[in-house]
From Swiss-Prot:
Zinc finger (FPG-type): 236-270
Co-factor binding details: Binds 1 zinc ion per subunit.
Database matches in HAMAP family: Fapy_DNA_glycosyl
Similarity remark: Belongs to the FPG family.
GO biological process: base-excision repair
UniProt EC number: 3.2.2.23, 4.2.99.18
Annotated catalysed reactions: Hydrolysis of DNA containing ring-opened 7-methylguanine residues, releasing 2,6-diamino-4-hydroxy-5-(N-methyl)formamidopyrimidine; 2'-deoxyribonucleotide-(2'-deoxyribose 5'-phosphate)-2'-deoxyribonucleotide-DNA = a 3'-end 2'-deoxyribonucleotide-(2,3-dehydro-2,3-deoxyribose 5'-phosphate)-DNA + a 5'-end 5'-phospho-2'-deoxyribonucleoside-DNA + H(+)
Name of the molecule in the record: Formamidopyrimidine-DNA glycosylase
Quaternary organization: Monomer.
Gene that produces this protein: mutM
NCBIfam families, alphabetized: fpg, PRK01103.1
GO molecular function: 8-oxo-7,8-dihydroguanine DNA N-glycosylase activity; class I DNA-(apurinic or apyrimidinic site) endonuclease activity; damaged DNA binding; zinc ion binding
Length: 271
């Protein structure tokens, strides 16, 4: 599933090129997770003012309203002047004066939704409960620690839930916990203030590094230019069960938490 770094990498790969483009046509294929929410003709003639990101959503600011795009489990975006003929898994094309923006989504858990603004009920429903942005000043270490103190849940699933901080997916939660020296099974309420500060910093460092490396291509992710990510190649623990820890050489362990795999080093990461 594309997480925050993949969505940010996607945004960076086409945001400047589409800014100012006039929408000429919108073509919708098979139904996605949610309906578009407007007639395609309503979008024609509008201009794309900017592309932002909130959590794992791309927000395309239009001259009237905005489009919220989610990549779902397997989605990716392409943008260009000469895209191939629409394929089986291409479900949304927005043809503009500067190129075509296309959503490719084999599993169709993604979506493109129109809202009249961020105060629109549709936008509030999708964005209203998201945690703070981890790469923004709003992600405060002291507030983060206070939030953890009131939770007795294991820290790894808590990070994935996205209520305290948004966009920390499975690979990035595993890597951040390793960097902070905290086991994924540690109860959040038991994490001390200094350890919470280390985890806060680790989350930011891991996500920043992931964006710089183009995200992670675990299956089929690519940015709007078709380029794969490389963060996964340097992972310290993720998907390395049984392999030696890159720091201490102890074998990396793997456990199931909920329906997700967690990877950790029992030597470097303490309960």
């Amino acid at each position: 599933m594309p997480e925050l770094p993949e969505v940010e990498v996607t945004r960076l790969s086409f945001a400047e090129r589409i800014a100012g483009a006039r929408i000429e046509a919108v073509l919708v294929g098979k139904p996605l997770r949610w309906p578009l929410g407007c007639e395609t003709q309503q979008l024609q003639g509008q201009r794309v003012l900017a592309v932002r990101r909130r959590g794992k959503y791309l927000l395309l600011d239009l001259s009237e309203g905005l489009l919220l795009m989610h990549l779902g489990m397997s989605g990716s975006v392409s943008f260009g002047l000469n895209l191939p003929v629409t394929g089986k898994h291409d479900h949304f094309d927005m043809v503009t004066s500067l190129g075509t923006l296309r959503l490719h989504d084999p599993r169709r858990f993604g979506a493109v939704v129109y809202a009249s603004g961020e105060d629109d009920a549709v936008a509030k429903k999708l964005l209203g409960r998201l945690g703070v942005e981890p790469l923004s000043d709003a992600f405060d270490a002291l507030v983060f620690h206070q939030w953890l103190k009131g939770r007795k849940t294991a820290i790894k699933p808590l990070l994935l839930a996205g209520q305290a901080v948004v966009g920390v997916g499975n690979i990035y939660a595993s890597e951040a916990l390793f960097l902070a020296g905290i086991r994924p099974t540690t109860k959040a309420s038991l994490i001390s203030k200094p350890r919470a500060a280390r985890l806060h910093r680790a989350i930011q460092d891991v996500l920043t590094n992931a964006v710089a490396k183009g995200g992670s291509t675990l299956r089929d992710f690519s940015n709007a230019d078709g380029e794969a990510g490389h963060f996964q190649l340097d992972a310290m623990v993720y998907d390395r069960a049984g392999l030696p820890c890159r720091v201490c050489a102890a074998p990396i362990k793997s456990i199931r938490q909920g329906q997700r795999s967690s990877f950790y080093c029992a030597t470097c990461q303490k309960p």
